[in-house]
Amino acid sequence: TVDGTDVMTLHGKSLRAFRRRIGMIFQSFNLITRTTVIKNVLTAFVPDMPWWRATFGIFTKDEKLKALDSLDKVGILDKAFVRADQLSGGQQQRVALARTLAQNPQIILADEPVASLDPVTAKQVMDDFKRINRDMNITVLINIHHVELALQYASRVVGIRAGEIVY
Protein backbone atom coordinates (compact mmCIF):
# COMPACT_ATOMS: atom_id res chain seq x y z
CA THR A 1 0.00 0.00 0.00
CA VAL A 2 1.37 3.40 -1.01
CA ASP A 3 -0.41 6.55 0.11
CA GLY A 4 -3.58 4.56 0.77
CA THR A 5 -3.53 2.79 -2.61
CA ASP A 6 -3.17 -0.98 -2.87
CA VAL A 7 -0.74 -1.06 -5.78
CA MET A 8 -1.24 -4.80 -6.31
CA THR A 9 -4.79 -4.13 -7.54
CA LEU A 10 -3.80 -1.55 -10.17
CA HIS A 11 -3.75 -2.41 -13.88
CA GLY A 12 -3.67 -0.60 -17.21
CA LYS A 13 -4.55 3.09 -17.08
CA SER A 14 -4.89 3.21 -13.30
CA LEU A 15 -1.39 1.73 -12.88
CA ARG A 16 0.08 4.21 -15.37
CA ALA A 17 -1.67 7.10 -13.61
CA PHE A 18 -0.32 5.93 -10.25
CA ARG A 19 3.22 5.62 -11.64
CA ARG A 20 3.05 9.23 -12.85
CA ARG A 21 2.83 10.29 -9.19
CA ILE A 22 6.26 8.77 -8.55
CA GLY A 23 9.47 10.33 -9.84
CA MET A 24 12.66 8.31 -10.29
CA ILE A 25 16.27 9.43 -9.93
CA PHE A 26 18.93 6.97 -11.08
CA GLN A 27 22.60 6.57 -10.21
CA SER A 28 23.55 6.91 -13.88
CA PHE A 29 21.33 10.00 -14.42
CA ASN A 30 19.60 8.50 -17.52
CA LEU A 31 20.06 11.66 -19.57
CA ILE A 32 20.20 12.03 -23.33
CA THR A 33 23.72 13.40 -23.32
CA ARG A 34 23.80 14.59 -26.94
CA THR A 35 20.96 17.06 -26.46
CA THR A 36 20.30 20.12 -24.33
CA VAL A 37 19.39 20.23 -20.68
CA ILE A 38 15.95 21.71 -21.42
CA LYS A 39 15.13 18.90 -23.87
CA ASN A 40 16.10 16.36 -21.21
CA VAL A 41 13.73 17.97 -18.71
CA LEU A 42 10.94 18.18 -21.29
CA THR A 43 11.03 14.38 -21.63
CA ALA A 44 9.14 14.31 -18.31
CA PHE A 45 6.00 15.26 -20.26
CA VAL A 46 6.27 12.61 -22.99
CA PRO A 47 4.18 9.90 -21.24
CA ASP A 48 1.18 12.26 -21.13
CA MET A 49 1.51 13.58 -24.69
CA PRO A 50 -0.28 12.48 -27.85
CA TRP A 51 1.99 10.23 -29.89
CA TRP A 52 2.42 12.77 -32.69
CA ARG A 53 3.67 15.52 -30.32
CA ALA A 54 6.04 13.07 -28.64
CA THR A 55 7.33 11.82 -32.00
CA PHE A 56 8.09 15.30 -33.31
CA GLY A 57 9.17 16.83 -29.98
CA ILE A 58 6.40 19.44 -29.94
CA PHE A 59 6.00 20.88 -26.45
CA THR A 60 3.51 23.49 -25.28
CA LYS A 61 4.48 26.84 -23.84
CA ASP A 62 3.22 25.66 -20.44
CA GLU A 63 5.41 22.54 -20.59
CA LYS A 64 8.44 24.64 -21.51
CA LEU A 65 7.76 27.07 -18.65
CA LYS A 66 7.38 24.17 -16.18
CA ALA A 67 10.68 22.71 -17.39
CA LEU A 68 12.45 26.05 -16.94
CA ASP A 69 10.90 26.45 -13.49
CA SER A 70 12.16 22.98 -12.52
CA LEU A 71 15.67 23.91 -13.64
CA ASP A 72 15.43 27.09 -11.58
CA LYS A 73 14.38 25.10 -8.50
CA VAL A 74 17.59 23.07 -8.65
CA GLY A 75 19.80 26.06 -9.45
CA ILE A 76 20.80 25.33 -13.05
CA LEU A 77 18.47 27.51 -15.09
CA ASP A 78 21.55 29.08 -16.68
CA LYS A 79 22.44 25.66 -18.17
CA ALA A 80 19.09 25.17 -19.98
CA PHE A 81 20.57 25.38 -23.49
CA VAL A 82 23.86 23.59 -22.78
CA ARG A 83 24.34 20.02 -23.97
CA ALA A 84 24.01 17.54 -21.10
CA ASP A 85 27.40 15.99 -21.85
CA GLN A 86 29.06 19.35 -21.17
CA LEU A 87 27.96 19.32 -17.51
CA SER A 88 29.68 17.99 -14.40
CA GLY A 89 28.30 14.92 -12.66
CA GLY A 90 26.58 17.03 -10.03
CA GLN A 91 24.98 19.24 -12.66
CA GLN A 92 23.80 16.16 -14.57
CA GLN A 93 22.23 14.82 -11.38
CA ARG A 94 20.45 18.16 -10.97
CA VAL A 95 19.11 17.86 -14.53
CA ALA A 96 17.73 14.43 -13.60
CA LEU A 97 16.17 15.97 -10.49
CA ALA A 98 14.66 18.84 -12.51
CA ARG A 99 13.19 16.31 -14.96
CA THR A 100 11.61 14.50 -12.04
CA LEU A 101 10.25 17.74 -10.53
CA ALA A 102 8.73 18.69 -13.90
CA GLN A 103 6.41 15.70 -13.69
CA ASN A 104 5.09 17.07 -10.36
CA PRO A 105 5.55 13.88 -8.32
CA GLN A 106 4.20 13.19 -4.86
CA ILE A 107 7.06 10.76 -4.17
CA ILE A 108 10.66 10.70 -5.42
CA LEU A 109 12.56 7.40 -5.42
CA ALA A 110 16.32 7.94 -5.71
CA ASP A 111 18.65 5.00 -6.37
CA GLU A 112 22.19 5.81 -5.22
CA PRO A 113 21.91 9.45 -6.37
CA VAL A 114 25.36 10.45 -5.08
CA ALA A 115 27.36 7.26 -5.74
CA SER A 116 29.39 8.71 -8.61
CA LEU A 117 29.81 12.20 -7.14
CA ASP A 118 32.64 13.77 -5.15
CA PRO A 119 31.88 14.50 -1.45
CA VAL A 120 31.21 18.22 -1.91
CA THR A 121 28.84 17.66 -4.84
CA ALA A 122 27.17 14.76 -3.03
CA LYS A 123 26.39 17.09 -0.12
CA GLN A 124 24.93 19.68 -2.52
CA VAL A 125 22.67 17.06 -4.13
CA MET A 126 21.55 15.78 -0.73
CA ASP A 127 20.84 19.41 0.27
CA ASP A 128 18.62 19.64 -2.83
CA PHE A 129 16.68 16.54 -1.79
CA LYS A 130 16.23 17.87 1.74
CA ARG A 131 15.04 21.27 0.48
CA ILE A 132 12.61 19.68 -1.97
CA ASN A 133 11.19 17.50 0.79
CA ARG A 134 10.86 20.44 3.17
CA ASP A 135 9.74 23.22 0.81
CA MET A 136 7.68 21.26 -1.72
CA ASN A 137 6.33 18.61 0.66
CA ILE A 138 7.46 15.78 -1.63
CA THR A 139 8.30 12.46 0.00
CA VAL A 140 11.87 11.45 -0.88
CA LEU A 141 12.95 7.82 -0.50
CA ILE A 142 16.68 7.29 -1.08
CA ASN A 143 18.62 4.05 -1.44
CA ILE A 144 22.14 4.98 -0.36
CA HIS A 145 25.26 3.16 0.82
CA HIS A 146 26.80 6.25 2.47
CA VAL A 147 25.62 5.66 6.03
CA GLU A 148 26.96 9.01 7.26
CA LEU A 149 24.91 10.89 4.64
CA ALA A 150 21.82 8.85 5.46
CA LEU A 151 22.16 9.68 9.15
CA GLN A 152 22.84 13.35 8.43
CA TYR A 153 19.94 13.94 6.03
CA ALA A 154 17.21 11.40 6.64
CA SER A 155 14.37 11.77 9.11
CA ARG A 156 14.13 7.97 9.10
CA VAL A 157 16.80 5.38 8.28
CA VAL A 158 16.32 1.67 7.60
CA GLY A 159 19.45 -0.48 7.38
CA ILE A 160 19.28 -3.66 5.31
CA ARG A 161 21.88 -6.43 5.05
CA ALA A 162 21.36 -9.60 3.02
CA GLY A 163 17.66 -8.77 2.66
CA GLU A 164 17.11 -8.41 6.41
CA ILE A 165 16.37 -5.19 8.30
CA VAL A 166 19.25 -4.68 10.74
CA TYR A 167 18.67 -1.07 11.83
Predicted segments with their positions:
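Conserved ABC ATPase "signature" region
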Residues: T5-D6, M49-D78
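Conserved catalytic motifs of ABC-family nucleotide-binding domains
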Residues: N104
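Catalytic Walker B motif of ABC-type/P-loop ATPase nucleotide-binding domains
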Residues: I108-D111
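Helix N-cap at the start of a conserved alpha-helix in ABC-type nucleotide-binding domains
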Residues: P119-T121
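H-loop/switch region of ABC-family ATPase nucleotide-binding domains
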Residues: I144-H145
